[in-house]
Amino acid sequence: MVYHCRMQTAWKYEKGVDTMKKQWKIIGALGLSLSLLMSSTALAAHPKGYWPYLSAFNNAKTANNQAQMITTGNKLLQYYQNLPLDSDVASIRYNVNYANYPIYEKQGNYTKAKEALQQVATNGAYLGFHDAVTMANERMRKISPNAQVYALTNTSAPYYGAKHEPKNGTLYGRVWTEQNDSAAQNEAIVSFYIEMGQNAADYERFIAPFEGGDHVIHIAWNFPGEGSTVSAINSGSYDSNIQQTLQYLATIDAPVLLRIGGEMNIWTTATTGDAFKAAYTRIAKQARTICPNVALVFSTNYTSPFGGSMEPYFPDASLVDWVGASLYNNKYQFASSPTKGVDNNEMYFGIGDYADPVKNLSHTADLAKKYNKPIIITEGGSGYLSGYADTTTFAADRIREAYTSLNMVYPQVKAIIHFDRSGSGYDYSLQNNATVQAAYNSALKSNPTLMSSPSQTVTQSFKPLSQVTGANGVVTLRAYCDVIGQTVTVTYSVDGKWVGTQKTVPYNCQLDTSTLTAGNHTLKVVCNAPNGYSQTLNYQLTKAANGSVSFKQA
């Protein structure tokens, strides 16, 4: 029955009909602007002398001469740069930048690509191409490499004072099954699915072995009818069941996190923000009284339908202790049809080359930051397939990044739950794939800020290198840099002397500062990718007479 609950939810990640309709809507809007530009009425409205510039750009575009598209496009934009904005000017700027941003991406010039996309968004908004604006804004978020260097420090991560939040460190664990029971016993947090309307006490025989304080227990309280269940809750139909469930949760001898109706932003049977907030509030207010041992979790899917948002569903912040997300990073949209999809589709929904755990969590991180809440990954993973479309390596790489980089880039991530189950589509179970299991184990071992027990004391956290002072001896450096579809190489050097090169996440480097003389030194970190992307991060490393070192980004 718990299996049925999960598989029902998993189907949503494969559902693509609505997504494709939205994508075609974008393509239609983009084509419309070009047809308007080419009409005789529009041509007559353009300023005198424009035609040689426009003709040169159109000829380059027709020939797919990308070098000439950039050159002639820039000349055309320069001709129009000082003209007041109207539909003709906006159409020129929109079309040139829309045609050329993919060329900049291909060259690894993401600064110019984002500048072009910003013009797509600005001029698209003027022209009323709202879907194109949505696409451009999300693409700017997804293509940015966000290169940054971090250091492992003896300082604490941000602490929000939320119920059952570790002051430092990140709890890790998995969704429980009979098959993974022994592994779950050795981790800090364990998750169980319960559906609205069920007798929660029936799960006591599974939950009881994890009581006693050695584990945090996460309850994913799902709404089986999705939006229709929300309506029933608001009508009072589930009041008795809600009270019984909360009374049971009050008896659990362990810290409890309760996810109330997760993933509401992608439900097939949709609900409104106001309706969901009313249902959440109806449950949460009772929970505050009946089971004060329970922390309340508001948890969405990591991405919303095209043009959608998590924000409309967020209830009163006083009724939310943690902000959560379901975070799945898969190679293909459909496990049943493992083929590459439309690029903008995969970009928007974080699939394939865009399935980066850090970037896919960015919308959730923005929401949590706004309301000063810790983050929990309430379920997630990277599924693997076998046979001709084997995605084992892809899945292992994403698992490795999730457990080495998520709480480095987002130190407010205080819990991660792996969806350790198999199904008819993607398989997320660790025990069924030795390569994925090894990546999971290796990542856990390499990250000293991950907690195998809620009682574990974590004394370290990752900080952006530019914020590090008072370090000494060997300093552990790591980097984050995601270049779409590329293998990144990170090279470290001090005063021109090579220190290390890494090609796998988290690009670890052990910098022995004891070998440096007192005074100022230059640490250079270079991120390269085969498509031509290159970014150099320079830091002034200052070593004091007592041996302590500090870093300042140049």
Language-model region placement:
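N-terminal substrate-binding region of glycoside hydrolase catalytic domains
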Residues: 61, 80, 84, 145-237, ...
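Substrate-binding cleft of extracellular glycoside hydrolase catalytic domains
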Residues: 197-299
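Long, low-complexity serine/threonine/glycine- and acidic-rich segments characteristic of extracellular
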Residues: 458-548
